[in-house]
From Swiss-Prot:
It comes from the Eukaryota. Keywords: ATP-binding, Chloroplast, Disulfide bond, Glutathione biosynthesis, Ligase, Nucleotide-binding, Plastid, Transit peptide. It is found in: Plastid, Chloroplast. PANTHER family: GLUTAMATE--CYSTEINE LIGASE, CHLOROPLASTIC. Belongs to the carboxylate-amine ligase family. Glutamate--cysteine ligase type 2 subfamily. Homodimer or monomer when oxidized or reduced, respectively. The lineage of its organism: Eukaryota, Viridiplantae, Streptophyta, Embryophyta, Tracheophyta. This is Glutamate--cysteine ligase, chloroplastic. The keyword Cell membrane does not apply. Pathway: Sulfur metabolism; glutathione biosynthesis; glutathione from L-cysteine and L-glutamate: step 1/2. The gene is GSH1.
Length: 523
């Protein structure tokens, strides 16, 4: 149901058709889980009893997995029903093995890009209501051959191959892309998606806005999507932070999901990703307005995460400990309070409860039941640090933005994390950064962007070196992908973030109105 209120003057939009090229579907074969574990840990564990148990549980319970390989979870889908009851409780080793199963050899590394966007009515600029979203999803499904994803009698998403379209709590429209080999394929996928969405949405008088935070409307104006898990989370958020509802209903992001070859490779990429995440936040800062006025931040979206739920967000300083590995991340995740479990096609409220208790069959709402690997995978998706580990690594620090930046964000991270030379240079560069310095950057960048003081200069100077490394990494990949960095190259050259350009327009050409942003950042 959409909650509506009277607000300022309307601003009509006349959009242009976006130039598009065909999307690209990529299908990759998953390596056998235990071959993966041998790659990850460098030992042959296939004969161990515990590993046989992992294999049994894994095959029985992994009805959903990650967007990687043959065992695929589609983001739009509710969890699968757990038809198979665990023969014996999961062990911590099983949970570690789940993460380790993501290891894959370099030739199988892929790029998975996700982005969210705000739908709005052209005539009023109001957010799309659920009924409009349902019509849009049905229209895309019928015209472009997507499979509908339902929760009860409500359409909540679409899937096609390894792509999915899903809804965030306030109706933010998300594309979770397929795992692809090159950035050219990634950008083609984005273009194909935007073409399909626009083809249906424009006939309905609907447009889409690429920014990190809803610039005009208050929480009371945002529709609530009919998804069971969101109701549980919405009721819990005010208990653990002051900005959680803003995060749910008024933010949009773009992120990239990248692979690792081994536990050691995961550690190196995790550390580089965390250290550089504030730079990505600055480069893509694009959320300076709240309810029609400047909000004092360049990335309001990033600031919101500092007071959403600090039990499940942040910079994870333990990743830089010498002892860090898959097991330590499992220990961390076990201590993150739960949100829910999915049983009998319903979400069971488990907010604030312990997954460790669940492992022991002592979860109060479902006493005597033990978790499956489905439950573990679902739990991992409710953890929101700046870099998140599942069976791949998610870079989570960037604001949503216009389509060129949807290609630039994966280009930035692929150039750094998928090239050994650039990755090592970043690790050398950030080796002596202290936890206090990383936290300082995390907390100050949302407000001051690239102008944040750092050591003897500004963060802009570090960012210039990092973007240079990303470009060199892309050049060495040999796919002629460096052009996708043009958007961020201009930002580091001038030190002016996208948000600062929007503020300049607001105080100048726009006459202190945010309404023109709906045309400026229209997809």
């Amino acid at each position: 149901m959409a909650l509506m209120s009277q607000a300022g003057s309307s601003h009509c939009i006349y959009s242009e058709k976006v130039r598009c090229i065909s999307g690209h579907r990529s299908i990759i074969n998953n390596m056998d889980m235990f071959r993966m574990r041998e790659i990850c840990f460098g030992v042959d564990i296939s004969s161990r009893n515990a590993s046989r148990r992992v294999q049994g549980n894994y095959l029985n319970h992994i009805g959903v997995g990650s967007r990687r390989g043959d065992l695929t979870i589609v983001a739009a889908s509710p969890p699968t029903e757990d038809a198979v009851v665990a023969a014996e409780p999961l062990t911590k080793e099983d949970l570690v093995g789940y993460l380790a199963s993501g290891c894959k050899s370099k030739e199988k590394w892929r790029i998975g890009t996700e982005h969210e966007k705000f739908g709005f009515e052209f005539g009023t600029l109001r957010p799309m209501k659920y009924d409009q979203i349902a019509d849009l999803l049905n229209g895309i499904a019928e015209r472009f051959d997507w499979e509908k994803v339902m929760e009860g009698d409500k359409i909540i998403g679409l899937k096609q191959g390894k792509q999915s379209i899903s809804l965030e709590p306030g109706g933010q429209f998300e594309l979770s892309g397929a795992p692809l080999e090159t950035l050219h394929q990634t950008c083609a996928e984005v273009n194909s998606h935007l073409y399909q969405v626009k083809a249906v949405a424009e006939e309905m008088g609907i447009g889409f806005l690429g920014t990190g935070f809803q610039p005009k409307w208050g929480l009371k104006d945002i529709p609530i999507m009919p998804k069971g898990r969101y109701e549980i989370i919405r009721n819990y958020m005010p208990k653990v932070g002051s900005l959680g509802l803003d995060m749910m209903f008024r933010t949009c992001t773009v992120q990239v999901n990248l692979d690792f070859s081994s536990e050691a490779d995961m550690i190196r990429k995790f550390r580089a990703g965390l250290a550089l995440q504030p730079i990505a936040t600055a480069l893509f800062a694009n959320s300076p307005f709240t309810e029609g006025k400047p909000n004092g931040y360049l990335s309001k979206r990033s600031h919101i995460w500092t007071d959403t739920d600090n039990n499940r967000a942040g910079m994870l300083p333990f990743v830089f400990d010498d002892s860090f590995g898959f097991e330590q991340y499992v220990d961390y995740a076990l201590d993150v309070p739960m949100y829910f479990v999915y049983r009998k096609k319903k979400y069971v409220d488990c907010t604030g409860l312990s997954f460790r208790d669940f492992m022991n069959g002592k979860l109060p709402p479902i006493p005597g039941e033990y978790p499956t690997l489905n439950d573990w995978e679902n739990h991992l998706t409710t953890i929101f640090p700046e870099v998140r580990l599942k069976r791949y690594l998610e870079m989570r620090g960037a604001d949503g933005g216009p389509w060129r930046r949807l290609c630039a964000l994966p280009a930035f991270w692929v150039g750094i994390l998928y090239d050994e030379g650039s990755l090592q240079s970043v690790l050398d560069m950030t080796f002596d950064w202290t936890a206090e310095e990383r936290d300082m950057l995390r907390n100050k960048v949302p407000k001051s962007g690239l102008k944040t003081p750092f050591r003897d200069g500004l963060l802009m100077h570090v960012a210039q070196d990092v973007v240079k490394l990303a470009k060199e990494g892309l050049e060495r990949r040999g796919f002629k992908e460096t052009g996708f960095l043009n958007e961020v190259a201009e930002v580091v050259k001038t030190g002016v973030t996208p948000a600062e350009k929007l503020l300049e327009l607001y105080h100048g050409k726009w006459g202190q109105s945010v309404d023109p942003i709906f045309e400026e950042l229209l997809y």
